Amino acid sequence: MDSRLARLTTLQTSAGEELRRTSIIGTIGPKTNNPETLVALRKAGLNIVRMNFSHGSYEYHKSVIDNARKSEELYPGRPLAIALDTKGPEIRTGTTTNEVDYPIPPNHEMIFTTDDKYAKACDDKIMYLDYKNITKVISAGRIIYVDDGVLSFEVLQVVDDKTLKVKSLNAGKICSHKGVNLPGTDVDLPALSEKDKADLRFGVENGVHMIFASFIRTAQDVLTIREVLGEDGKDIKIVVKIENQQGVNNFDEILKVTDAVMVARGDLGIEIPAPEVLAVQKKLIAKSNLAGKPVICATQMLESMTYNPRPTRAEVSDVGNAVLDGADCVMLSGETAKGNYPINAVTTMAETALIAEQAIAYLPNYDDIRNCTPKPTSTTETVAASAVAAVFEQKAKAIIVLSTSGTTARLVSKYRPNCPIILVTRNARTARFSHLYRGVFPFVYEKESVSDWTEDVEARLNFGIEQAIEFGILKKGDTYVSIQGFKAGVGHSNTLQVSTA
């Protein structure tokens, strides 16, 4: 039974003994920022710690990093990755007089201004916006959302270079420092604010493994971030967050220069009509899969578990369908940052992802990816694809990859084998950021290399087999496929072997 439909007719409805291959990202907040809770989250399935730099001081974020590392001392397990999520360039309202929240009735006409004299003197008649060019990029008839769409305004008139006349489309309250969205409008905000640049430098100094870059609109935005990261941050992975129509429109060019992608559905669902988010999610994930770039699905995945011990059935389906779409990782935000049930949320996400993975028709999926990948491929990718083909033909239980940079493991993951990928590397950073790749189980080999290359390969391979057996991935006598290089260094993975444990 190779067809997708035939596979679904035999689908097991329980998790069974399979190992989850989708990685879980959890945002760390005050309720989870301690080593003991981080250990519990890791045991439940957490792979990547996310720090949200829209909130918190450097002192606080440093404590998250320290506690994440302390959790590894308490519970070694698999290595934990740390991600820095930038605040990004945003448009916000000014400060209301005495910080009052002003009620706004429907059809209420008022002024939006960029005049600095109103920055701290806003009310229900005049509201300051901190985007100086708004009058240049917007026109009458356009919609402006305030506070994640809680309030909607129609632009009636561009009065002058600092002033818009607007009309409310619904009732609500207008407040200080709320986010502003301009759906359907191309904005010219810089890729990085001064705060973002300082935050990136903090990330480099403190050894984060990846950057979640907010509000990416163009490929140049990614190059700007890479420039700020500099030589010391050259091995930090950049994950672009696609959150607006510009990012969607320019996605093909962005994909060429980024390391990974996040479909950030929160702001995206405000910037474009919410029903279109479904199609955009599937499209961006498919393009990322074909490019061999890892992709994260994020925002409101188990939102109700912030305050409830059980998710809604729709949320469970959302997580499962993201896995079926091809997401390498799924992410929790408030559920683990401020929620009452963070460990429950990770456990629920892990169990849901595991069952969803069993619904994937792996062989047809492999054929799709292989047929749609432009030829010729690199030697490393050819070997990676062949290793996955060997898994199907040999019914192998694992692929063991000996790698320095992690590129081979990423390319094996691209072809979505129906078994775990054991990555053995001496590079601890490679092990950590490889959590971005679906199915990759990283292990750090700490022994020094020996001069005899064959002996060194055999030692690392045996280590990989030992780890796979310890984690229940392999049993004695199981078939596995291995990939290694013919000599030391990066980019030489060209040897494939089928063996038994």
Curated annotation (Swiss-Prot):
Cofactor: Mg(2+); K(+)
Annotated EC: 2.7.1.40
Sites where the protein binds Mg(2+): E243, D267
Single GO MF annotation: pyruvate kinase activity
Gene3D superfamilies, sorted: Phosphoenolpyruvate-binding domains, PK beta-barrel domain-like, Pyruvate kinase, C-terminal domain
Binding site for ATP: N52, F53, S54, H55, R92, K178
CDD domains the UniProt entry points to: Pyruvate_Kinase
Pathway entry: Carbohydrate degradation; glycolysis; pyruvate from D-glyceraldehyde 3-phosphate: step 5/5
Catalysed reactions, as listed in the record: pyruvate + ATP = phosphoenolpyruvate + ADP + H(+)
Class of the enzyme per the UniProt entry, highest EC level: transferase
Matches recorded under InterPro entries: Pyr_Knase, Pyrv/PenolPyrv_kinase-like_dom, Pyrv_kinase-like_dom_sf, Pyrv_Knase-like_insert_dom_sf, Pyrv_Knase_AS, Pyrv_Knase_brl, Pyrv_Knase_C, Pyrv_Knase_C_sf
Superkingdom per UniProt: Eukaryota
Site feature: Transition state stabilizer: K241
Pfam name, any one: PK_C
Gene Ontology CC annotations of this record: cell surface; cytosol; extracellular region; fungal biofilm matrix
Complex formation: Homotetramer.
Protein family according to the UniProt entry: Belongs to the pyruvate kinase family.
Protein name per the record: Pyruvate kinase 1
Organism: Candida glabrata (strain ATCC 2001 / BCRC 20586 / JCM 3761 / NBRC 0622 / NRRL Y-65 / CBS 138)
Organism taxonomic ancestry: Eukaryota, Fungi, Dikarya, Ascomycota, Saccharomycotina
Encoding gene, per UniProt annotation: PYK1
